[in-house]
């Protein structure tokens, strides 16, 4: 199991939480909505050849801006901060390690695709400490931190509300130290608790 895919799935869950598990969303003159989220989950997986349970908690806040003028009011920019703490336990042995991360995500101004009134291109920037993985003694074993930039083509559906459908995405660039970005997560699990 590749690390980047598992991390992206957790981050996507946080994004969904931002839109569905909000606590007292509010808005000011330039915002569609803003709020906070706080959620926990537990899951057991066996992709590494034995049962590993992840107990996790993430919190964050988000702001969705009102539709931007350059897109005819159709694109709503998201800014989000997420913090995650998790413990991974080998169910057979009780051995465990912890992982934490904190990221800041922001969508840059979007541009309408020529000839369209709902399809936009947008870049996203995400920065932070992507992973700090510690063994059971608390020693840092892996750490990833830096910046990621992606470019997306997105159909807003022309309904003047946040959301829509992704059409394509392209990785643009990265900077920083990425010990875990494309690592074999099961190799890390085996090393620390296998």
Which residue stretches match the model-derived regions?
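Beta-strand-enriched cores of mature, soluble protein domains
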Residues: 30-194
């Amino acid at each position: 199991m590749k690390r980047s895919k598992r991390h992206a799935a957790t981050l996507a869950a946080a994004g969904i939480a931002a839109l569905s598990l909000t606590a007292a969303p509010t808005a000011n003159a330039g915002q569609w909505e803003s709020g906070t989220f706080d959620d926990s989950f537990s899951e057991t997986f066996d992709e590494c050849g034995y049962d590993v349970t992840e107990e996790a908690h993430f919190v964050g806040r988000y702001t969705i801006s009102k539709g931007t003028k350059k897109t005819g009011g159709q694109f709503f920019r998201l800014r989000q901060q997420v913090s995650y703490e998790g413990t991974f336990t080998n169910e057979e042995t009780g051995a465990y390690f912890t992982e934490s991360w904190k990221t800041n995500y922001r969508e840059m101004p979007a541009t309408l695709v020529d000839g369209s009134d709902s399809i936009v291109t947008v870049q996203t920037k995400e920065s932070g400490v992507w992973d700090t993985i510690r063994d059971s003694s608390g020693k840092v074993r892996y750490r990833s931190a830096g910046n990621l930039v992606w470019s997306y083509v997105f159909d807003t559906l022309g309904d003047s509300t946040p959301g829509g459908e992704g059409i394509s995405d392209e990785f643009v660039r990265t900077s920083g130290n990425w010990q875990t970005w494309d690592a074999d997560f099961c190799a890390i699990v085996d090393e620390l608790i296998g």
